[in-house]
C-alpha cells in the first residue's frame, strides 16, 4: 500500500501510545481513521485532537476481547464510511510483570485474552470483510520484541506476542492472493502508558500472582519514558506498510541479541550428514503432501463456489 489517501484505517488501542501515533501519521497521510479503544473518554479526546489536525476520524469504544462488540464495531465502520477498512492495525495490548511460577489463571486469561485473542478477534472479524470488498489492503499487528524469546518475568505476554508473530506470518501467506499485505511490528520500549494497563484489568480477572501497585507502575514508567516516540514508531510502521515488509523492527540496539538468539537455534539443528536418507524421505513426503494439499483445497473451493 503506497497511497493512504481516503483509505479507512481501523486502529485498536488507537486513543493513546503506539495506536494514537499511527492514527496521526496515517491520518496526516490522508487516511480516514477509526479510533477503537476500551476507554470512552480517551476515545473522545483522541478523535477531537485528530479532527483538530484536519483528519477525518471516528471513535468506537471497544473491548477487543468481546467478539460480539467487535462485529458491531465492524458494522458501524461500514455504516459510517460505506466500506470495510482497507488498513487494519491490531495495536491494543496490556502487560503485567511477575515471576512466571506465580502466574495465575487470571493472569493468563487477561494478558493472553487481550494480546492474542484480541488480535484473533480482529482478524476473524475483518479479514472476510476485507476480502469481500475486493479492495487491496494491509494488516499490521503490533507485537513485541518479547515475542521472539521467552521471559521469566513476562511469561504470558511473551507467549501471546510469539503467537501473534506466528499468526501474522501465516496470514501473510494466505492473504497475498487477495492483494492484502500483512506486517508485524515488534517494538522494544515505546513511550506510552502501557505501565498503567493494570488499572484497566477487569475485576473478573482480578486474582494475580504479581505485585501490582503504585511502586511497580512507577518502576515500569521509568523504562517506558525513554522508549521510542509513538509517532516515530508509527512512521516506521507506515514505511513497512508501504514496502509490504513482513517484519518491522526500528530498534538497532536489538540486532545483536536477536542474532545470538536465532544463532543458538540454528546451531541446535542436526547436521545433514547425521541422517541424509531420512532427511531426503521426509522432504519428499512433505513436498508431495504440499502438492496434494493444493489440489484438495482447490477442489474444495470449487465445490463451495
UniProtKB/Swiss-Prot annotation:
Pathway involvement of the protein, from the record: Secondary metabolite metabolism; lignin degradation
EC nos: 1.-.-.-
GO BP annotation list: lignin catabolic process
Residue positions binding NAD(+): 10-34
UniProt GO molecular function: oxidoreductase activity
Keyword tags: Lignin degradation, Oxidoreductase
Active-site residues, Swiss-Prot/TrEMBL: 157 (proton acceptor)
CDD domains: SDR_c (cd05233)
Family to which this protein belongs: Belongs to the short-chain dehydrogenases/reductases (SDR) family.
Protein name as catalogued: C alpha-dehydrogenase
Protein's organism: Sphingobium sp. (strain NBRC 103272 / SYK-6)
